[in-house]
Amino acid sequence: MKARRSTRMFRSIVVTVLVSSGMLRDVTAQSSTGRGPAPSLVAPKSTASAPRADGFLRRWLVLEPVRTKGQLTESAVQAAVKTDVFADPLTVLPRDRDTVTVDGSQLTWHAVDTTEYNVNLYHFAYALGKPTSNVLFWAIAVVNSPREITDVRLAIGSNAASVWWVNGKEVIALYNDRQTVIDDGVSRRLTLHKGRNIVRAAIVNAGGATDFCARFLEPAYKPITDLTVTLANQ
């Protein structure tokens, strides 16, 4: 009996200390709004992001996950990305914190910089308290080129399936369950205009980890680094 009373008294003291210090309140607030920041994703702090020597695009505008069936075949993925779950998914150019309504739920666009070569969508969704399985992610990068560059290729990797567009034209896609591999898919030759180019991606995940990476390659497959990535309002 004395042991039980001592245990209850100890718990009471711990709760009192947590409440008085604000720690319990902070933990509760965090769990109700999300799970804390994603380990490899940060809010942009500069007006432009330049690729490193490896050429990967590290600034993206990502929409919170849209629920889907999570089927990864070519026909299923193409059907998912061409369904207008919100207005003009293949032409919209949103700003950070813009929202769309999908099946009665409000989803938000988030500007993110990745500290790695890839964008970890599992971390992105988990940190926001959003689903990570049977979902579709939309991502947009505004890529600025100081010159017109011909015969370049968009090289991508994704987990799992993905479809990619450059300046409104579909250029590459990956299907079925897969891990992200650098340059797993390489587009046909295309032209980057001088000035602004819009790269758009749709990534479908059935379950587990999910991420993507992308970069532009010169004809000799050397990464292009004299680009900048900005947001729509920059």
Predicted regions and their residues:
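N-terminal secretory signal peptides that target proteins for export/translocation
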Residues: 1-9
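Bacterial N-terminal signal peptides
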Residues: 11-25
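Accessory carbohydrate-binding/adhesion or oligomerization-edge regions at the termini
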Residues: 30-123, 201-234
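Extracellular beta-rich ligand/substrate-recognition surface
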Residues: 127-137, 176-180
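Non-cytosolic beta-sheet module surface loops
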Residues: 145, 154-158, 203-205
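Aromatic-lined ligand-binding clefts that engage carbohydrates, nucleic acids, or primary amines
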Residues: 150-165, 199
